[in-house]
């Protein structure tokens, strides 16, 4: 049996508890609907994350292959000099957006792909293999930033799902059962009190009639 609430067994408390149960059940339904919607959104984004991860792994494989080719064709030292001469890439701005009531990151950045002349090593190395390797790693960077945003969104949605689940379970298995058990107890207690009053009045009536007869 569920634990009872510490309230007085009165009709006022009975009415109050019935109202609270109605509100709790409405709240439970809203939270359950929210939980279901969050789970659907989570798996939609999860599928996107899997696709991005596959694409990233493929592009990283290609990028390292082109880097190895550039090292063979241009030489280790010229490649290192080109890497040291590369200008910093564009800045990334992290904002916030709302997904199902959850604040998640929104990474705003223009594409990382640049022309060879914009990378800073144009006069250091003219090998086309270095340019190809740089281009492939810029593609990797584009995907990595997008994947980071999606994976962080998944983490936050997962936390919100867990929080919502705990609230749903608390209402379903603890709060509502306790209130319903208390309502049942108050009804029983009020019935007992009503019977006690009935028999008390009956005895009083009998005493009055007995005295009147004597």
Curated annotation (Swiss-Prot):
Bilayer topology: Peripheral membrane protein
A GO biological process held by the record: proton motive force-driven plasma membrane ATP synthesis
Pfam families referenced in this protein's UniProt entry, alphabetically: ATP-synt_D
UniProt-listed Gene3D superfamilies: 1.10.287.3240
Gene Ontology molecular-function annotations: ATP binding; proton-transporting ATP synthase activity, rotational mechanism; proton-transporting ATPase activity, rotational mechanism
Subcellular location: Cell membrane
Assembly, per entry: Has multiple subunits with at least A(3), B(3), C, D, E, F, H, I and proteolipid K(x).
PANTHER family assigned to the protein according to its UniProt record, in alphabetical order: V-TYPE ATP SYNTHASE SUBUNIT D (PTHR11671)
Protein name: A-type ATP synthase subunit D
């Amino acid at each position: 049996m569920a634990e009872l609430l510490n309230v007085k067994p009165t009709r006022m408390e009975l009415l109050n508890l019935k109202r609270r149960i109605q509100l709790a059940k409405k709240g439970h339904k809203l939270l359950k609907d929210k939980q279901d919607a969050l789970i659907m959104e989570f798996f939609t984004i999860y599928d996107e994350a899997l696709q991005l991860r596959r694409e990233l792994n493929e592009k990283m494989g290609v990028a390292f292959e082109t880097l190895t080719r550039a090292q063979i064709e241009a030489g280790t030292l010229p490649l290192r000099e080109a890497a040291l001469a590369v200008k910093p890439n564009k800045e990334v701005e992290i904002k916030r957006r709302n997904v199902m009531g959850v604040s998640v990151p929104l990474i705003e950045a223009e594409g990382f792909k640049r022309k060879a002349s914009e990378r800073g090593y144009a006069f250091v190395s003219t090998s086309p293999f270095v340019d190809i390797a740089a281009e492939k790693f810029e593609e990797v960077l584009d995907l990595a930033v997008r994947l980071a945003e999606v994976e962080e969104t998944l983490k936050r949605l997962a936390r919100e799902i867990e929080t919502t689940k705990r609230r749903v379970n608390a209402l379903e298995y603890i709060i509502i059962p306790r209130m319903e058990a208390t309502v049942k107890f108050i009804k029983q207690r009020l019935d007992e009190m009503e019977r006690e009053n009935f028999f008390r009045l009956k005895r009083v009536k009998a005493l009055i009639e007995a005295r009147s007869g004597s």
